[in-house]
């Protein structure tokens, strides 16, 4: 009898209610089973989830459900990264308080996530804007302050003129603010910093232990930390060219071997010498101001046009007093990196070459590529940056660059310049302390108080939390806390005199740098429960976008170490395994030059071509490129619409099935429809066979078709489990498609009453195993199918969500036959299928019976037959 069509809307709501009522996914910290902590990067509550969220959380849910089935005590929590500028922007635009806007969005997105059927422990939910959360963050801040890991200093900062706030270097992308896209300016402000540089060496060395992270991410962090070993060289200023009080320029270089190729020295716009020279020099002052319009990050420097201002100052070459080099103020040198001064060797650095060509400076090659002639070798438009031998370098000629480095260092370390060595070896790091001050309202208040008499001191712990005031106005840009007199003005905790609160709030990346720790015991009064944190950490599998490779992941690695120093955790690394998933992308569409939504168009096949038109008017629509889903290009698919049309399991199945998880997946309506047809097919096969299988005990087949059914499903159990372990979800999906194809005929026989007892036992086992294997990807369908089969696994009543992962029989997984390629005189002519344990004589005899071998021998005998066991057969005719 034909089964009723599967209704995902009814089934999914039912099973979600069952799981919630049974508290199926709540995790007990006292459970003695082996732990497994899986976590997807928690979302910013922007208003609605998108298909990228669906893919990210579906992947994490597959891992969580699979590990739960494998017997682990799984922690799979969810929360909200809820502070940030969009809430303030919404407050200004829509006249709604950031808190109200944020919590409304959380409610909407929580409903959406719940509709996906994710196996999340919602009892541990928090938002980083919850007072209970940022109270503990303020406690952490004070702990780190007392451990000397927080400092306050004046420095050049990246100022976003649109968002009116400071940005960390990592938040400046191609010279622009990471959120606003505005060109970043430099300003000098007093800021709060976390001393991440105290851990530079540790953070670098720790990357070698993270063998379950993508190498690309580790490389990005290595480059960002940027350890370099070089030489700090003092260049004496030429007599008569320098202002009073200046006698030298100190330069840090990683290439002292190229000193004889030097063409200039460049100093930062903020170098003391540059500042002195700008006094009374309007042209130089103007140039320095122009430099300050750039960001303070290396990325900003790399993208900006390289410019310099010739100061007229000269320095002497360290090895030749008669050789003078011009000193430029340059926009590509930062005071915060090295010494704020560099020497330029145009032949062997592309930036220096571009600069030298622009200002017509001499280009002298000093490293000769292997096989080149020193007399004829020259530099064109591209600097030579590889290895070779030294030339044009006097006493260094003929050395390797490495040997030349050491020779230069050795000589200059022994050379006295005004009572000190002319050079010293130095290790430098590109990493800078993390500036966390933000001039915003919607963030965690920094718990410090400023007193003219006592200085800056922490808020007493008994007075925490420092809560954000609700009665603020967003009628103009800037920080409303600066304008809130009753909140800002307080008494000094030391002297009792008039004082003021710190009005800067913390960078929102602080909030996400320790949330994974809070999930281990979010009910605690202290920031962490040390026992729970040490039990659950590190996170076994962390899943999120590669765009967080530096910012969030590096900060979290620092924060874990800082929390260890403060006694809150006992681990060094926060995330044992890291997986960076690809994006969900979609075609773009335009009508009359305007972006249009996929929901507003119709696509048809006409004469073999896809043609798009507007639904309402029939007007032609241009089908554009496939791009990341974005509201601006209107190529967004709303998960609510997909779930309403097809169900959550279809959405989950599709985003897992179409591409390797690390690559982008292209969302198509046809793909979603195909996934839904598969959902319906599984349901129909199971539901129609269920009456015949409901009361049958599961038992593997031992012969004939029943044995074939059992072999197929046991092989799938092994393979799908291996695929999930490797996060190769698309391969696991493909195997399940294949298994359903294999089982469909036998299940139809059972539905038609044509299966014998052995086949029924094999099918009952196979169907249970199929249901359990699909459960991590399509959990609602799996529960509905098992209910149709009587709600039992191996004879015991259970929810699929609580059932163990099926166990394969090794004997059924091993192939009894093997296919051997057969060559004749070294060329493959065909294959031989034979028992895996066949001896050499049996293989040779079977080969002689093959038609293509008989034809090649033409009635004769072979000279010999070479058998490579389990590999290949070669017939020598």
UniProtKB/Swiss-Prot annotation:
Record keywords: Isomerase included?
Answer: no
Q: An example Gene Ontology cellular component term from the record?
A: cytosol
- Database matches in SUPFAM superfamilies: Anticodon-binding domain of a subclass of class I aminoacyl-tRNA synthetases (SSF47323), Nucleotidylyl transferase (SSF52374), ValRS/IleRS/LeuRS editing domain (SSF50677)
The record's listing under Gene3D superfamilies reads:
2.20.28.290, 3.10.20.590, HUPs (3.40.50.620), Isoleucyl-tRNA Synthetase, Domain 1 (1.10.730.10), Valyl/Leucyl/Isoleucyl-tRNA synthetase, editing domain (3.90.740.10)
GO terms (molecular function) for this protein are: aminoacyl-tRNA deacylase activity; ATP binding; leucine-tRNA ligase activity
Q: Does the keyword Aminoacyl-tRNA synthetase apply?
A: yes
InterPro entries xrefs: aa-tRNA-synth_I_CS (IPR001412), aa-tRNA-synth_Ia (IPR002300), Leu-tRNA-ligase (IPR002302), Leu_tRNA-synth_edit (IPR025709), M/V/L/I-tRNA-synth_anticd-bd (IPR013155), Methionyl/Leucyl_tRNA_Synth (IPR015413), Rossmann-like_a/b/a_fold (IPR014729), tRNAsynth_Ia_anticodon-bd (IPR009080)
Question: What does it catalyze?
Answer: tRNA(Leu) + L-leucine + ATP = L-leucyl-tRNA(Leu) + AMP + diphosphate
Q: Where is this motif: 'KMSKS' region?
A: 628-632
Q: What is its EC number?
A: 6.1.1.4
State the family named in the UniProt similarity comment for this chain.
Answer: Belongs to the class-I aminoacyl-tRNA synthetase family.
Q: What is the official name of this protein in its record? A: Leucine--tRNA ligase
Q: From which source organism is this entry?
A: Brucella abortus (strain 2308)
């Amino acid at each position: 009898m034909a089964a009723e069509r599967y209704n995902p809307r009814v089934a999914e709501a039912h099973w979600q209610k069952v799981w919630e009522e049974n508290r199926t996914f709540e995790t007990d910290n006292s459970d003695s089973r082996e732990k497994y902590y899986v976590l997807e990067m928690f979302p910013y509550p922007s208003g609605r989830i998108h298909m990228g969220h669906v893919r990210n959380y579906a992947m994490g849910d597959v891992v969580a459900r699979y590990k739960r089935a494998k017997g682990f005590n799984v922690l799979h929590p969810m929360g909200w990264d809820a502070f940030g500028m969009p809430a303030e922007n919404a407050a200004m635009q829509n006249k709604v308080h950031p808190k109200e806007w944020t919590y409304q969005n959380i409610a909407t997105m929580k409903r959406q996530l719940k509709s996906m059927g994710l196996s999340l422990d919602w009892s541990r939910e928090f938002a980083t804007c919850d007072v209970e959360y940022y109270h503990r963050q303020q406690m952490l801040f004070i702990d780190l302050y007392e451990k000397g890991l927080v400092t306050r200093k004046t420095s050049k900062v990246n100022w976003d003129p649109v968002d009116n706030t400071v940005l960390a270097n990592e938040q400046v992308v191609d010279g622009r603010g990471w959120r606003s896209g505005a060109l970043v300016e430099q300003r000098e402000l007093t800021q709060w910093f976390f001393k991440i540089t105290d851990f530079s060496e540790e953070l670098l060395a720790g990357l070698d232990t993270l063998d379950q992270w993508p190498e690309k991410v580790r490389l990005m962090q290595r480059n960002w930390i940027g350890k370099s070993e070089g030489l700090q060289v003092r260049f004496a200023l030429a007599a008569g060219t320098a202002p009073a009080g200046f006698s030298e320029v100190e330069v840090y270089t990683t290439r002292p071997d190229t000193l004889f190729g030097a063409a200039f020295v460049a100093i930062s716009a903020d170098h003391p010498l540059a500042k002195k020279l700008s006094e009374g020099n309007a042209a130089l002052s103007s140039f320095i101001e122009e430099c300050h319009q750039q960001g303070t990050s290396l990325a900003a420097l790399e993208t900006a046009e390289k410019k310099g201002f010739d100061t007229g100052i000269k320095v002497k070459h360290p090895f030749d007093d008669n050789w003078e080099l011009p000193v430029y103020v340059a926009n590509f040198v930062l005071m915060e990196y090295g010494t704020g001064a560099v020497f330029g060797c145009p032949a062997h650095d592309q930036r220096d070459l571009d600069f030298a060509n622009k200002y017509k400076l001499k280009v002298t090659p000093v490293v000769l590529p292997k096989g080149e002639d020193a007399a004829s070798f020259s530099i064109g438009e591209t600097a030579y940056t590889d290895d070779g031998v030294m030339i044009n370098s006097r006493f260094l000629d003929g050395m390797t660059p490495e040997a030349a480095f050491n020779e230069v260092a050795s000589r200059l370390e022994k050379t006295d310049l005004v009572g000190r060595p002319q050079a010293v070896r130095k290790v430098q790091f590109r990493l800078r302390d993390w500036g966390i001050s933000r001039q915003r309202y919607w963030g965690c208040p920094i718990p410090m108080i400023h007193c003219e008499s006592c200085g800056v001191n922490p808020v007493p712990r008994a007075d925490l939390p420092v809560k954000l005031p609700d009665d603020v106005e967003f009628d103009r840009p800037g920080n409303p806390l600066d304008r809130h007199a009753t909140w800002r003005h307080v008494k000094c905790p030391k002297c009792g005199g008039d004082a003021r609160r710190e009005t800067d709030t913390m960078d929102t990346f602080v909030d996400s740098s320790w949330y994974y720790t809070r999930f281990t015991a979010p009910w605690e009064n202290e920031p962490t429960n040390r026992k729970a944190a040490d039990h659950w950490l590190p996170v076994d599998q962390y899943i999120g976008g590669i765009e967080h490779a530096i910012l969030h992941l590096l900060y979290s690695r620092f924060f874990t170490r800082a929390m260890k120093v403060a006694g809150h955790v006992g681990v060094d690394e926060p995330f044992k395994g890291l997986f960076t998933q690809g994006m969900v992308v979609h075609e773009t569409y335009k009508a009359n030059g305007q972006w249009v939504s996929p929901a507003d168009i119709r696509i048809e096949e006409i004469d073999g071509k896809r043609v798009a038109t507007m639904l309402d008017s029939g007007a032609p629509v241009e089908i554009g490129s496939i791009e990341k889903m974005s509201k601006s290009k209107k190529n967004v698919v709303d998960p609510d619409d997909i779930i309403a049309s097809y169900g959550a399991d279809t959405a989950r199945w599709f985003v897992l099935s179409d591409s390797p998880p690390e690559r982008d997946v292209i969302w198509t309506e046809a793909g979603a429809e195909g996934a839904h047809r598969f959902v319906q097919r599984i349901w129909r096969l199971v539901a129609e066979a269920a009456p015949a299988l409901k009361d049958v005990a599961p038992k593997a087949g031992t012969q004939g078709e029943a044995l074939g059914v059992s072999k197929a499903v046991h092989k799938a159990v092994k393979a799908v489990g291996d695929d999930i372990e490797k996060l190769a979800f698309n391969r696991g999906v493909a195997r399940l498609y294949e298994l359903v194809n294999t089982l469909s005929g036998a299940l139809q026989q059972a539905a038609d009453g044509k299966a014998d007892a052995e086949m029924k036992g094999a099918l009952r086992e196979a169907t249970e195993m199929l249901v359990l294997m699909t459960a991590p990807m399509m959990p609602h369908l799996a529960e509905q199918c098992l209910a149709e089969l009587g709600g039992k696994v191996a004879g015991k009543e259970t929810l699929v969500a609580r059932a163990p992962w099926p166990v394969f029989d090794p004997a059924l997984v091993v192939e009894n036959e093997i296919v051997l390629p057969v060559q004749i005189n070294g060329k493959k002519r065909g294959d031989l299928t034979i028992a895996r344990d066949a001896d050499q004589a049996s293989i040779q005899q079977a080969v002689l019976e093959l038609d293509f071998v008989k034809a090649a021998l033409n009635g004769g005998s072979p000279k010999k037959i070479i058998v490579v066991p389990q590999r290949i057969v070669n017939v020598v005719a």
